[in-house]
């Protein structure tokens, strides 16, 4: 059995983890819709937060991971690092799009419009556009090494935009709600039940993220192995042809 053939079969741990992710996601949604109390000011609209915040955080994490793998490719030149960078970029594209959708869902009942040029929403849209640009670059460049180098640089640029996005609500006049969970050590201003439900959904989103990226890396490595085998076979065929001619 060749490596390419053995790699085509999904590992058992990945299947089990996929089921676990689905169960945890279902429990998170149940907690958001049933367990969590309505917010004192926003009522049941707060339930959007339990999906919106986790996908936003995981979108940032995906971009950061993709950029790190891109940097490692620029340093080491290993094709598998580019595969990992692309897999995380795909997750970043998905989660960033879901972040904007969640923001628009929240905006409609509160501001009576799906879209405003709010700093936070606009910067997230810009980040999504840059990620789309990453995949456009990958589609336009055929030579694998050059494609990996250029796309790595693009993702590093996307990474540089993250601090502006994260701090937009503090730096600019924005319609985005104030943070209830602060990373600066100032604590948490949230009902304990709501916080527990939020953390459950963050864990669920993280599990889905890990499963998605792991599956995409598996498929990418399989395609990489098959491509390398095809190149080796073509090289051997050409060398055999030259020997016959000589």
Residue ranges of predicted features:
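Polytopic transmembrane helical bundles with strong interfacial aromatic enrichment
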Residues: 1-246
């Amino acid at each position: 059995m060749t490596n390419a053939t053995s790699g085509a079969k999904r590992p058992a741990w990945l299947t089990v983890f996929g089921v676990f992710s689905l169960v945890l996601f279902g429990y998170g949604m149940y907690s958001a819709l049933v367990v969590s109390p309505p917010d004192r000011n926003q009522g049941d609209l707060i339930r959007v937060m339990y999906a919106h915040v986790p996908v936003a955080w995981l979108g940032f994490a995906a971009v950061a991971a993709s950029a790190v793998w891109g940097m490692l490719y620029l340093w080491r030149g290993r094709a598998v690092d580019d595969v990992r960078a692309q897999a995380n970029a795909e997750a970043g594209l998905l989660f960033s799009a879901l972040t904007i959708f969640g923001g628009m869902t929240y905006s409609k009942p509160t501001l009576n419009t799906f879209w405003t040029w709010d700093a936070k929403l606009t910067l997230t849209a810009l980040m999504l556009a840059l990620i789309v640009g990453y995949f456009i670059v990958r589609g336009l460049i055929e030579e694998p090494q050059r494609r990996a180098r250029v796309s790595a640089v693009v993702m590093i640029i996307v990474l540089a935009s993250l601090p502006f996005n994260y701090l937009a609500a503090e730096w600019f006049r924005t319609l985005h709600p104030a943070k209830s969970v602060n990373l600066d050590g100032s604590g948490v201003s949230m009902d304990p039940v709501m916080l527990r439900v939020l953390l459950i959904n963050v864990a669920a989103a993280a599990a889905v993220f890990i499963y998605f990226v792991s599956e995409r890396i598996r498929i990418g490595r399989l395609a990489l192995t098959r491509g390398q085998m095809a190149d080796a076979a073509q090289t051997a065929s050409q060398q055999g042809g030259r020997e016959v001619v000589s």
